[in-house]
A protein has these predicted regions:
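Conserved S-adenosyl-L-methionine
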Residues: 46-51, 135-139
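Conserved hydrophobic helix-helix packing surfaces used for dimerization/oligomerization
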Residues: 28, 52, 115-117
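Short helix-loop-beta connector
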Residues: 21-27, 112-113
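Glycine/small-residue-rich loop that forms an oxyanion/phosphate-binding "nest" at active or ligand-binding sites
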Residues: 1-24
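NAD(P)-binding Rossmann-fold cofactor-contacting core
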Residues: 49-69
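Rossmann-like adenosine-cofactor binding region
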Residues: 72-141
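Glycine-rich adenosine-cofactor-binding loop
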Residues: 17, 26-45, 56-57
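Adenosine-phosphate binding glycine-rich loop
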Residues: 116, 120-180
Length: 180
């Protein structure tokens, strides 16, 4: 017997990206190198983005990601982020999540010169990264959009029924999450 797996993070991120981004993106900073980052990186490769830098402090995840995706454009030290400019910054790490550390300060310093911010963290719904993006008038999307967009095809596959992401569903989920 064969077992097949599927991952809906790709779909969830693709829909989030397509709703937010309104112009050609050339330079991206992807923060994190775990499972969600892998799906996002695959989407970005499919979009033929010119430059993707991955910021991770985990040498093990760097090694795993570079081997599995044949990718080796990593930033390990946040000091390397100084004076960089990106069209899009994506936080695909657990940094900023409830009970976790925030991102490195050098990441926050990049926000005002960035066209778009996507933070896939959804608890709390407003992370420091999203707050800084809003204060800087940078178009952004928090993690709730991706959570709902990846949950939809997953639910449909498991229960063999179509659903829509209604305002009711969004507000029901929102009421369960924190806003810190």
């Amino acid at each position: 017997k064969k077992v097949y797996g599927d991952n809906t993070d790709y779909i969830g991120f693709a829909k989030t990206y397509q709703k937010l981004v309104k112009r050609r993106i050339d330079k991206i900073l992807l923060i994190g190198a775990g499972g969600a980052a892998r799906s996002i990186l695959q989407f970005l490769n499919d979009e033929e983005i010119n430059q993707i830098d991955i910021f991770t402090r985990s040498l093990n995840k760097k090694k795993t990601l570079s081997k599995s995706m044949r990718f080796d454009n990593f930033i390990i030290d946040s000091k390397e982020l100084r004076n960089k400019r990106y069209d899009l910054i994506i936080n695909a790490s657990d940094a900023g999540m409830l009970g976790r550390k925030n991102l490195a300060n050098n990441v926050y310093k990049l926000v005002s010169n960035t066209a778009y911010i996507i933070d896939i963290v959804y608890n709390p719904m407003r992370t420091k990264l999203i707050d800084i993006a809003k204060a800087s008038n940078v178009p952004n999307d928090g993690g709730l959009g991706m959570l709902l967009e990846q949950a939809k095809p997953s639910f449909e596959a498991w229960f063999n029924t179509k659903i829509s992401i209604s305002q009711y569903l969004r507000s029901k989920l929102t009421s369960q999450l924190r806003y810190e």
